[in-house]
Amino acid sequence: MTKFVFVTGGVVSSIGKGIVAASLGRLFKSRDYSVSILKLDPYINVDPGTMSPFQHGEVFVTDDGAETDLDLGHYERFTDTPMSRLNSVTTGSIYQAVINKERRGDYMGGTVQVIPHITNEIKERIHRVAKNTNPDIVIIEIGGTVGDIESLPFLEAIRQFRKEVGRNNVVYMHVTLIPWIPAAGEMKTKPTQHSVKELRSIGIQPDVLVCRCDRPLQPGLKEKLSAFCDVPVASVIMSQDASTIYQVPLNLEEEGLAQQTLELLNLEPRQPDLSQWRTLVQQMQSPSKQIEVALVGKYVQLSDAYLSVVEALGHAAIATNSVVKIRWVSAEDLENDSAEQHLEGVSGIVVPGGFGVRGVDGKVRAIEYARHHNIPFLGLCMGMQCSVIEWARNIAHLEKANSAEFDRESPNPVINLLPEQQDVVDLGGTMRLGLYPCRLTPDTQTFALYKQEVVYERHRHRYEFNNAYRSLFLETGYVISGTSPDGRLVEIIELPGHPFFIATQFHPEFRSRPSTPHPLFLGFVKASVDYNHVSLDSKIQTHIELVTEENTPSIALG
């Protein structure tokens, strides 16, 4: 029978429940247990697809086209297991399903209430993950903070869940904060005590406490928490801040989190194999070189808006024994300032996805700068569309070339709406979403990186390259290195004679993993490292020449 671990959070939001859930999944997998992780989000949106990146951060897209919380990206990267739409549940989707059932008459005229109808639907979603993927263990992260009114139906549902499936098949894990108070010179447990008290008032007694802290727990603190929260000392787990999130599974393993949880579930503890993971972390912590890459985006004020891009760059950095320092550049700043002012000195430029006209001209200027100065460039989704616009304006000399998304009156809409999107009215869940095949063109840089003819990548867009301009682009030197299998949709472009200039309509960042960096990100980081060396050698040579000139004595001829 499938076992279930529920992860709740207390005291503050953004406590790190997602990383704890993902880390626990990694620890279970290292013991050869199959795992699936489910996120229950208490917001009323049906999914995060229409939410502002400034509020929610990145929208992570699964193979089956679900627009989900960024935590699902952590789940996939840590467990190396693909998630699906079943792994993301929101209050909005729960209420939508219940109301649809009521409209169909499924409740036979009964009064529809939070208990039992909403809670039953929540429990059904949890069971659905277990039935469809049949894992040994399902980890369920409950979004929000204990005490929030929005979380109450989910907490009531998981309270009922243990009674229905059996005490030995469920573990309640509570992630909480142990703050350090400088004035007192000590750590305080009172916030955690109150958080556990709040959980108990709902009918949930946590089995495991995961204590987030910025320094080691002081002597006696675990015993104190054990006494006041009625949790065994061995189940009070320290989770100290780490230099990288990939260190967290190793820290939690040292604290015995997986072993304690497996014992509570009556499962064999087994010996973990974390050798590969330890090697990855060691490589991250001992790089031999550093490069600086500019990320030119619309939402750079919140780095979580580009979380998977940042992680994919990090994965490639591990493989190249380097560290990637990101220079966050607002695309809007490039509309008013010179590109050189913001981009000088970088070894690579990434232009990621986005929606809407704001900042587009800044992205175009960044791409022009990369092309002119032979700086490695990687464009993603809108980044590819902007590279098409840049080429159309500056090389193909198409007057007022633009995307139909940004200028419906453009005489040269080199990016146009997909035909199947013409009659779409709703915004949520209606784009070209999920995994699609892409056929690569032989003898291209892209083909050399992937080393295969057909690849599968995740998409999230409504607009595509306008094929009315394909011949003109090819005539002016553009290379189309990837298309849909029928050749209709342009999916990848590149420029010959450039160290690295590749742009994709899809989002390769969603399929990158710490142990298997995505080929395009790996190629980009390698090219950026090479560019950095060439640039540094050039600067050294210039310095030598200047010094030589300054030290050359002047000779008077007469």
UniProtKB/Swiss-Prot annotation:
The Glutamine amidotransferase type-1 domain, residue ranges: 292-534
Highest taxon of source: Bacteria
Chain positions recorded as CTP binding sites: 13, 148-150, 188-193, 224
GO cellular component: cytosol
Keywords associated with the record: ATP-binding, Glutamine amidotransferase, Ligase, Magnesium, Metal-binding, Nucleotide-binding, Pyrimidine biosynthesis
Active site residues according to the UniProt entry: 381, 507, 509
EC number(s) stated in the UniProt entry for this protein: 6.3.4.2
Catalyzed reaction equations: UTP + L-glutamine + ATP + H2O = CTP + L-glutamate + ADP + phosphate + 2 H(+); L-glutamine + H2O = L-glutamate + NH4(+); UTP + NH4(+) + ATP = CTP + ADP + phosphate + 2 H(+)
GO terms for MF: ATP binding; CTP synthase activity; glutaminase activity; identical protein binding; metal ion binding
Binding site for Mg(2+): 71, 141
NCBIfam families linked to this entry: PRK05380.1, PyrG
Subunit organization: Homotetramer.
UniProt protein name: CTP synthase
